[in-house]
């Protein structure tokens, strides 16, 4: 089975579905991790190489088969053209051909997490050529659930 995990930032995939990744790898599944904010050096530039190396070591330990990095910077996704953004997600889905997809929870307050869900859902909608069997949301223990939408029941 092909598994595709969209991670807004480095370590979101480990914090959110690290245990699931280990379990699925032991079952023989093919795991692709797609890092949405892979552009280097914008946040903590002095630590960039160390953080990247740590991510690669963890991916190797878990058995990640494929890594896809988007050319977008952390906390700058709102400035990316929606066409370019959505196309990157569509290309990742075409490349990974996932049976299952894991996304951050849509109610997370962190804007990069919200936009990751938006981009992925555009790429995964039924009209596209390739659709997975299942889509799951994962928690990253940051601001999940804080951004609960207001549902109004009265209008003035």
What are these regions (language model features)?
Residues 7-25:
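Di-metal (Zn2+ and/or Mg2+/Mn2+) metal-binding site signature of metallo-dependent hydrolases
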Residues 15-18, 34, 118:
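Generic hydrophobic alpha-helical membrane-span motif
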Residues 30-40:
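A short beta-strand-loop structural module common to alpha/beta enzyme folds
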Residues 35-36, 69-73:
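Short glycine-rich catalytic loops that host catalytic nucleophiles or stabilize transition states
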Residues 1-6, 23, 27, 43-54, ...:
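Metal-dependent de-N-acetylase/amidase catalytic core
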Residues 8, 36-38, 140:
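Cofactor-binding loop segments of dinucleotide-utilizing enzymes, especially the Rossmann-like FAD-
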């Amino acid at each position: 089975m092909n598994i595709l995990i969209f991670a807004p930032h480095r370590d979101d995939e480990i914090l959110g579905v690290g245990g699931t990744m280990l379990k699925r790898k032991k079952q023989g599944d093919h795991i692709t991790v797609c890092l949405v904010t892979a552009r280097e050096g914008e946040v903590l530039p002095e630590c960039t190489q160390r953080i990247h190396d740590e991510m690669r070591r963890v991916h190797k330990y878990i058995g990640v088969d494929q890594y896809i990095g988007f050319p977008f910077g952390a906390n700058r996704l709102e400035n990316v053209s929606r066409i370019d953004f959505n196309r990157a997600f569509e290309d990742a889905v075409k490349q990974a051909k996932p049976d299952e997809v894991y996304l951050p929870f849509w109610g997370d307050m962190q804007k990069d997490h919200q936009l990751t869900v938006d981009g992925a859902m555009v790429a995964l909608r039924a009209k596209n050529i390739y659709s997975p069997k299942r889509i799951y949301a994962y928690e990253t223990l940051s601001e999940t659930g804080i951004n609960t939408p207001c549902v109004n029941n009265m209008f003035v």
